[in-house]
């Protein structure tokens, strides 16, 4: 049966307040790190673990937080501006990219970041040649958007670039919660093992070499999912146009409440360095 989220037409003010996300601000600090290890998760996903004393005090409270990655120059030198200076060099700013922290180990002072490697760009180029000892700069996160786990369930929709955030969210969800995940990857080789204490359903959508960013494949998959029950939080992260289409369909066709439906553009066809929240 088509996906129909069983949400109240007009949630009470009390319910909306109980489900309201929190925001946290963080001090912006430029951190110098080096690569500790590189792990090939799938043909198109690398996990790079960073280390360094500058990671002390790192904080990321939201599952879809993002940090800015600052890349070395063509000589492999990471030229971070000294504390107190105003801004970054233009070339470094243009090459910055947003990535979700996968996991942070405060005791070991290590930070893992997953890289979906597809089209050429500064992040993909750096990740593909990364090796132990290579330098990388980290800035942020500037803030965290903390979504309660107290919903009856969570619907998480995305593509390869969204997998790190989806993985984080699944780690956070408690037993007794429903989690429905719909992820588009190229083929079965790019599927990852997803774990959660929640009652988890995972639906993989394969594009089989077709260009990424087509909303129709995920829209078709949603129509095949059995209806969940209870109040659901909906989270979408995709190519910009596709994310807008998915959010609109969830609200207009599947009964999702706008306040419980967050969509983000993790990339945009024809553009570089895009990361934006979609409000409508």
Kindly give the residue locations of the regions a language model identified:
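Extended, composition-driven regions rather than compact fold-specific motifs
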Residues: 2-280
């Amino acid at each position: 049966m088509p996906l129909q989220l069983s949400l109240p037409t007009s949630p009470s003010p009390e319910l909306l307040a109980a489900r309201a996300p929190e925001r946290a601000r963080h001090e912006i600090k430029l951190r110098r790190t080096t690569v500790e290890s590189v792990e090939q998760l799938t043909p198109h996903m690398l996990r790079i673990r960073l280390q360094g004393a500058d990671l002390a005090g790192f904080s990321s409270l939201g599952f879809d937080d993002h940090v800015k990655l600052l890349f070395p120059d063509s000589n492999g030198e990471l030229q971070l501006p000294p504390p107190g200076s105003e801004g970054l060099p233009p070339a470094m700013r243009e090459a910055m990219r947003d990535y979700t922290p996968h996991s942070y180990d405060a005791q070991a002072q290590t930070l893992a970041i997953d890289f979906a490697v597809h089209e050429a760009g500064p992040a993909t180029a750096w990740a593909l040649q990364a090796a132990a000892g290579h330098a990388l700069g980290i800035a942020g996160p500037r803030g965290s958007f903390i979504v309660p786990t107290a919903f009856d369930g969570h619907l998480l929709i995305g593509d390869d670039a969204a997998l790190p955030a989806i993985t984080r969210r699944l780690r956070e969800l408690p037993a007794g919660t429903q989690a429905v995940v719909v992820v588009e990857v190229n083929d079965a080789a790019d599927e990852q093992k997803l774990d959660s204490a929640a009652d988890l359903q995972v639906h993989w959508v394969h594009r089989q070499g077709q260009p990424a960013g087509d909303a129709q494949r995920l829209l078709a998959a949603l129509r095949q999912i059995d209806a969940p029950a209870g109040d659901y939080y909906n989270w979408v992260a995709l190519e910009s146009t596709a994310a807008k289409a998915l959010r609109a369909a969830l609200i207009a066709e599947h009964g999702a409440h706008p306040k419980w439906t967050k969509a983000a553009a993790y990339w945009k066809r024809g553009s570089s360095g895009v990361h934006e929240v979609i409000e409508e």
